[in-house]
Design a protein with these regions (language model features):
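C-terminal functional modules
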Residues: 1-30
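Beta-strand segments within the central parallel beta-sheet cores of soluble alpha/beta enzyme folds
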Residues: 302-306
C-alpha cells in the first residue's frame, strides 16, 4: 500500500473525507516526510513547493480580492513507525481576500517520530484567514510535535485558528504561536487537547494588540487523565487605544494527571483592556450527579461531560 493511500485512509480520524483529494475544485497538498505526494491549486491560489533533504519548503499565496470557494486541505504526516518531518511554510493572504485552510497532521503508526513546523503568515488589509488544524498521532504515544508560527494580522483583517488533538495519544506536543494585530484587526485562537497515559502538552500562545481597536481571544480547553501533564500559557499584550483582549483557559484533571495554566496579561495604554480567566479542576460533581440521576453510568457521565468541554 502506498504512503499516499495510507495517509488518505487516516483522514477520517481528523474529520476529513479521502475523496477531497480527488475533487478538481478543491486545492490540496499531501506531504509524507520530506516528499510531496500530491498537490492541486485553484484560481486565485498560488502554491510554490520544494522538496529538500531536510524539509518541505513552501509558499501559499492568495491573490488580493480572491475568495477561495472551498477550504484548502494541507495534509502532512508519516505513515511509518519512525521518521522525521520538517515543514517550513510562508502563507500570504492578499488584501480583501478570504480563505479557509484545513491542516491535517497524520501520524497513525508513530512510535518514535518527530514533526516540526515553522510558519509565517501575513494577512493583508481587510482579508480573512481561517486556519483549522486537526491532529492524529496514533495510539502509541511516540510522537513529538513542535509547531512554531508567527502571524501578522493587517488592518481590519481577521484570523481565526482552531487546533484540536482529541483522538489517540498526544505524545509530546509543544506549540509556540505569536500573533501581532494591527488597527481594527481581530484574532481568535482556540485549542482543544485530550491527554492520556504519559502525554506531555506545552501550549504557548501570545498575542500583541498593536493597533487601535485591535481585538483578540485566546481560548484553551484541555482534559488530562492517567499520568499526563499539561502546561498552558496564554499571553495578551495591549499597546493601543481601544484594544481589547481576553484569555480563557479551562483544564480538567483526572487520575494522576497534572495541569497548570499561566495567563499573562499586559497593558501599555490607558485606553486598552485585557481580561483573563483560568480554571483547573475535576469533573463538576453537580453535573455528574445530574447525569447519573438520568440513568447514565459514572463512566458514561464523565465521558459526556468531557466531550462537551472539548466540543
Amino acid at each position: 500500500m502506498s504512503e499516499l493511500n495510507d495517509l488518505r485512509l487516516t483522514l477520517p480520524m481528523v474529520g476529513a473525507e479521502p475523496a477531497i483529494l480527488d475533487d478538481p475544485s478543491i486545492a490540496h497538498v499531501v506531504g509524507h516526510g520530506h516528499h510531496i505526494l500530491s498537490h492541486r491549486t485553484v484560481p486565485g491560489l498560488h502554491l510554490d513547493l520544494e522538496e529538500r533533504p531536510e524539509a518541505i519548503v513552501g509558499k501559499l499565496a492568495v491573490e488580493a480580492g480572491a475568495h477561495i470557494a472551498h477550504p484548502i486541505h494541507m495534509c502532512f504526516g508519516l505513515a511509518h513507525e519512525t521518521g522525521a518531518q520538517q515543514i517550513n511554510i510562508n502563507v500570504e493572504v492578499g488584501e480583501q481576500a478570504h480563505v479557509h485552510v484545513l491542516a491535517h497532521c497524520l501520524f497513525p503508526l508513530a512510535k518514535s517520530a518527530q514533526h516540526r513546523m515553522s510558519a509565517t503568515m501575513t494577512i493583508g488589509q481587510g482579508a480573512s484567514l481561517t486556519y483549522t488544524e486537526g491532529h492524529y498521532h496514533g495510539p502509541f504515544g511516540g510522537m513529538q510535535v513542535l509547531p512554531h508560527a508567527t502571524i501578522r494580522v493587517g488592518r481590519g483583517a481577521r484570523y481565526f485558528s482552531d487546533f484540536s488533538l482529541l483522538s489517540g495519544s498526544v505524545g509530546n506536543l509543544e506549540i509556540d504561536y505569536l500573533v501581532d494585530i494591527e488597527e481594527d484587526g481581530i484574532a481568535e485562537l482556540t485549542a482543544k487537547v485530550f491527554g492520556h497515559n504519559n502525554d506531555r502538552i506545552y501550549l504557548k500562545e501570545a498575542i500583541r494588540l498593536l493597533g487601535k481597536r485591535a481585538r483578540s481571544l485566546i481560548k484553551t480547553r484541555a482534559v488530562m487523565e492517567d499520568a499526563s501533564r499539561a502546561e498552558i500559557t496564554g499571553i495578551t499584550e495591549a499597546h493601543a487605544a481601544g484594544a481589547r483582549g481576553h484569555v480563557d483557559c479551562m483544564e480538567v484533571v483526572q487520575g494522576q494527571a497534572h495541569a497548570s495554566a499561566i495567563p499573562i496579561v499586559r497593558v501599555f495604554h490607558p485606553e486598552a483592556k485585557v481580561t483573563h480567566e483560568a480554571a483547573i479542576g475535576s469533573v463538576d460533581k453537580h453535573e455528574l450527579e445530574t447525569l447519573m440521576a438520568r440513568g447514565l453510568a459514572p463512566e458514561q457521565a464523565v465521558e459526556l461531560i468531557v466531550s462537551g468541554i472539548l466540543r
